[in-house]
């Protein structure tokens, strides 16, 4: 529902009272990410009216995590509109099928590579895609599982030359008019077209992030946006922080929640490797998700989740990081 710009606190109190009497929440709608214990620190999950940023190095799984959150939200019965600037809809479907198989059959499930091969195959299959994946670690069941929530995920094949913040707003407005409050995923912010001729990337990023924050507030939807690192961040060998993201000052100010991904091997303190070299390989299998900003709760929290990239997913049951972390990368030969 589009929010009115002026409202009496008397009306707000009356609505809160009425909601309490009905046994309903008077606050923000909560969209669980499905990642534990991240949701507990976020007060249950992503919140309507808030902008959440997801940043980190290239190739560490930002899209993987965003798509997995989208899947979890859709599977819970909520709508998702996914603005995809780098992946087509078939690629996203392929990832979801592999992810779904992994959730059901664990590491014995069909791999992302095998699902891609099945999708790309040209041989006739009377049973469709499920038939091509029959006998491959729960592949056919995964196709059926995706089908149960696929209608609730709408993919917008976005274009860096034409898909502006106004286009994003227009698409979301169509959902809201139909009385649907979707999770909005933008993959990724720096690809969103800016109609004004601005001299540098920081200014363009500022325009986009401000527009996404306004969108979240105006329509009462949660927005999850992926953010790329700036040039210095891309060259950095240690831990990426919020100030390593493109347009970092605007991002830090406008966002309600900032999540930063880092490879655990790259950020764990030296003494954890020096005294137990075997840890090095173990740490490579985990990503550290740092809650760098959280307007609704605690921040500066470091959590870890196991990578299962052969199935295009993370293990959603994570832990608080027990080891000391550092901003400087430690190399062990």
Where in the sequence are the language-model features?
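C-terminal regions of RecA-like/P-loop NTPase motor modules
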Residues: 2-14, 58, 102-113, 117, ...
